[in-house]
């Protein structure tokens, strides 16, 4: 399938036409394809797919090729349990250097006193923070009162008393249905099982945080941890007020800025809206508005540094040195002036998109946004969030359904959509494109209708969009994305030619594989055998699988998307 794509590229380009980023990308794929061609093909297909959809998922973005390259090296081979210069393994001097550099970059970027860059995910970071707080606030004072310095010195009876004490503390975070995250105390998550959770909610009428009500609840409950942050709240947070509340009740203020870390780093949220300034501990992911690798980190005041650095063995095992290297690169990138421009553009685009949605007659939770996301109520369209999500994906727009406050449709079907601007802003889109996207969303949702199940009842999960609407919207999506190319350094036709041809025996796909492309049975123009010579409208195919009845499907008009190669179906599947 592949006889050194890198060699082919270098042999056909003049020196001034060679792009170093593409060379690095090709070299990586060449190595992968030599061992496992399908994986290289799937990586290229993911690039094709991401270039084919307008990405409005608020928790996703596009990392730089430099960030990606920092992860593809031998650092992945190294165990480095512990923290810099205090490891459980020898020979970690280079990992010490990398982790220390990443932590220093994070501190400089956010103005933090201490940074811990080992967590693999936001959930991991929150667990480390929770246990660091429990350790410093509950465990260490208890050990001191017993005249010992470590839990290993306790008797079985003493340890059980301490364990029960640590497991009976209160966590007060934003309710899941008000926009809080699963890890903020949701009962189906470990956080809801390791604490006595006393969640606060947004105001039922305004959808906004009511700081007076939160203070009254905190005084009544007196939690160990007051947690501020969100995954689906479209407004900014006053962290100064949260800190004042925490101080009044003796709580530790923890902030989860996973969604808006890039807005903090870029100077969009400053003063009272800066969680790092006011919180004792701050957790975050690196891959959302911060545009880094998939991972997380923790920032904290000096008094919590020792407890946080014990994330291993408290919660984590070995860190991922190659990802910590990529985090360092991302933090350095975010310290550039260009990132500040980007961060402000993210919010400007979110506000422009919100205004345009309202002008299109759509209803937004809280009437707008202060950050990178907005919540759209789809009930006026007669749809559930799940139906709306599927209808838009079928038309080339990716986003996710989301519960609204006090949502009657629950957490699975939902009544809303969460829409974010980080990724489209990374592509260079601006307010005018946001207006166009709002029109596309309105057109799709206005045309979508629930489908009927086999029993004749209306489905709450599936919806269909008329073919002419889908075709029109997909055409606009293609035109829009053609002007804002993801990773323009990467030559897609070249990658297709060298990596996406399916080897014999692996060129079948199932009907459900077409769902992401918005293809329905009505799109089938004709079905012919692999050896059949057809008319000029459908080019013949020469590939097939040995011993299998394979048919090729020709699409009348591939709705949006990366269906530029024939799609194969086994006879049984078709």
Curated annotation (Swiss-Prot):
<keyword id="KW-0663">Pyridoxal phosphate</keyword>
<comment type="similarity">
    <text>Belongs to the SHMT family.</text>
</comment>
<dbReference type="InterPro" id="IPR049943">
    <property type="entry name" value="Ser_HO-MeTrfase-like"/>
</dbReference>
<dbReference type="InterPro" id="IPR001085">
    <property type="entry name" value="Ser_HO-MeTrfase"/>
</dbReference>
<comment type="subunit">
    <text>Homodimer.</text>
</comment>
<comment type="pathway">
    <text>One-carbon metabolism; tetrahydrofolate interconversion.</text>
</comment>
<keyword id="KW-0028">Amino-acid biosynthesis</keyword>
<feature type="binding site">
    <location>
        <begin position="180"/>
        <end position="182"/>
    </location>
    <ligand>
        <name>(6S)-5,6,7,8-tetrahydrofolate</name>
    </ligand>
</feature>
<dbReference type="GO" id="GO:0004372">
    <property type="term" value="F:glycine hydroxymethyltransferase activity"/>
</dbReference>
<dbReference type="Pfam" id="PF00464">
    <property type="entry name" value="SHMT"/>
</dbReference>
<dbReference type="InterPro" id="IPR015424">
    <property type="entry name" value="PyrdxlP-dep_Trfase"/>
</dbReference>
<dbReference type="GO" id="GO:0030170">
    <property type="term" value="F:pyridoxal phosphate binding"/>
</dbReference>
<dbReference type="InterPro" id="IPR015422">
    <property type="entry name" value="PyrdxlP-dep_Trfase_small"/>
</dbReference>
<dbReference type="GO" id="GO:0035999">
    <property type="term" value="P:tetrahydrofolate interconversion"/>
</dbReference>
<dbReference type="InterPro" id="IPR039429">
    <property type="entry name" value="SHMT-like_dom"/>
</dbReference>
<keyword id="KW-0554">One-carbon metabolism</keyword>
<comment type="pathway">
    <text>Amino-acid biosynthesis; glycine biosynthesis; glycine from L-serine: step 1/1.</text>
</comment>
<comment type="function">
    <text>Catalyzes the reversible interconversion of serine and glycine with tetrahydrofolate (THF) serving as the one-carbon carrier. This reaction serves as the major source of one-carbon groups required for the biosynthesis of purines, thymidylate, methionine, and other important biomolecules. Also exhibits THF-independent aldolase activity toward beta-hydroxyamino acids, producing glycine and aldehydes, via a retro-aldol mechanism.</text>
</comment>
<protein>
    <recommendedName>
        <fullName>Serine hydroxymethyltransferase</fullName>
        <ecNumber>2.1.2.1</ecNumber>
    </recommendedName>
</protein>
<keyword id="KW-0808">Transferase</keyword>
<feature type="modified residue" description="N6-(pyridoxal phosphate)lysine">
    <location>
        <position position="288"/>
    </location>
</feature>
<feature type="site" description="Plays an important role in substrate specificity">
    <location>
        <position position="287"/>
    </location>
</feature>
<dbReference type="InterPro" id="IPR015421">
    <property type="entry name" value="PyrdxlP-dep_Trfase_major"/>
</dbReference>
<keyword id="KW-0963">Cytoplasm</keyword>
<dbReference type="GO" id="GO:0005829">
    <property type="term" value="C:cytosol"/>
</dbReference>
<feature type="binding site">
    <location>
        <position position="306"/>
    </location>
    <ligand>
        <name>(6S)-5,6,7,8-tetrahydrofolate</name>
    </ligand>
</feature>
<dbReference type="InterPro" id="IPR019798">
    <property type="entry name" value="Ser_HO-MeTrfase_PLP_BS"/>
</dbReference>
<dbReference type="GO" id="GO:0019264">
    <property type="term" value="P:glycine biosynthetic process from serine"/>
</dbReference>
């Amino acid at each position: 399938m592949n006889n050194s794509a890198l060699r082919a590229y270098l042999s056909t380009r003049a020196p001034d036409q060679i792009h170093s980023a593409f060379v690095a990308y090709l070299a990586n794929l060449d190595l992968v394809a030599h061992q496992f061609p399908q994986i290289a093909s799937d990586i290229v297909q993911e690039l094709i797919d991401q270039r084919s959809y307008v990405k409005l998922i608020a928790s996703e973005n596009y990392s730089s090729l430099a960030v990606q390259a920092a992860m593809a090296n031998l650092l992945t081979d190294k165990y480095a349990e512990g923290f810099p210069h205090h490891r459980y393994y020898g020979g970690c001097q280079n990992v010490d250097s990398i982790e220390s550099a990443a932590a220093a970059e994070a501190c400089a970027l956010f103005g933090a006193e201490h940074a811990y860059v080992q967590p693999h995910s936001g959930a991991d970071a929150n667990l480390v923070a929770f246990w660091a707080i429990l350790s410093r606030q509950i465990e260490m004072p208890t050990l001191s009162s017993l005249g010992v310095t470590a839990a290993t010195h306790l008797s079985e009876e003493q340890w059980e008393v301490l364990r029960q004490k640590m497991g009976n503390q209160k966590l007060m975070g934003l309710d899941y249905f008000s926009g809080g995250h699963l890890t903020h105390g949701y009962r189906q998550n470990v956080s809801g099982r390791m604490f006595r959770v006393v969640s606060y909610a947004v105001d039922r009428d305004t959808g906004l945080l009511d700081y007076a009500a939160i203070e009254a609840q905190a005084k009544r409950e007196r939690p160990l941890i007051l947690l501020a942050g969100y995954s689906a709240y479209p407004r900014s947070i006053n962290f100064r007020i949260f800190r004042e509340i925490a101080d009044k009740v003796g709580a530790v203020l923890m902030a989860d800025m996973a969604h808006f870390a890039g807005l903090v780093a870029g100077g969009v949220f400053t003063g009272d809206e800066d969680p790092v300034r006011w919180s004792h501990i701050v957790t975050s992911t690196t891959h959302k508005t911060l545009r880094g690798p998939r991972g997380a980190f923790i920032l904290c005041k000096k008094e919590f540094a020792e407890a946080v650095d014990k994330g291993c063995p408290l919660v984590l095992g070995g860190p991922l040195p190659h990802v910590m290297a990529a985090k360092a690169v991302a933090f350095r990138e975010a310290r550039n002036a260009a990132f500040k421009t980007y961060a402000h553009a993210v919010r400007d685009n979110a506000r422009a998109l919100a205004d345009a949605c309202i002008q299109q007659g759509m209803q937004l939770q809280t009437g707008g946004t202060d950050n990178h996301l907005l919540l759209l109520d789809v009930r006026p369209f007669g749809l559930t969030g799940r139906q709306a999500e599927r209808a838009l994906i079928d038309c080339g727009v990716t986003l996710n359904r989301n519960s609204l406050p006090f949502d009657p449709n629950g957490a699975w079907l939902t009544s809303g959509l969460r829409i974010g601007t980080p990724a489209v802003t990374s592509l260079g889109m601006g307010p005018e494109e946001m207006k166009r996207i709002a029109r596309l969303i309105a057109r799709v949702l206005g045309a979508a209708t629930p489908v009927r199940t086999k029993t004749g009842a209306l489905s709450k999960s599936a919806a269909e969009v008329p073919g002419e609407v889908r075709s029109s919207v997909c055409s606009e999506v293609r035109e829009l994305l053609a002007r804002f190319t993801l990773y323009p350094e990467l030559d897609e036709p070249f990658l297709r030619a060298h990596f996406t041809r399916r080897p014999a025996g692996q060129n079948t796909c199932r009907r459900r594989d077409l769902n992401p492309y918005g293809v329905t049975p009505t799109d089938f123009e004709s079905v012919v055998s692999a050896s059949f010579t057809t008319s000029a409208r459908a080019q013949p195919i020469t590939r097939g699988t040995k011993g299998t009845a394979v048919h090729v499907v020709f699409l009348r008009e591939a709705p949006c998307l990366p269906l530029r190669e024939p799609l194969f179906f086994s006879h049984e599947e078709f």
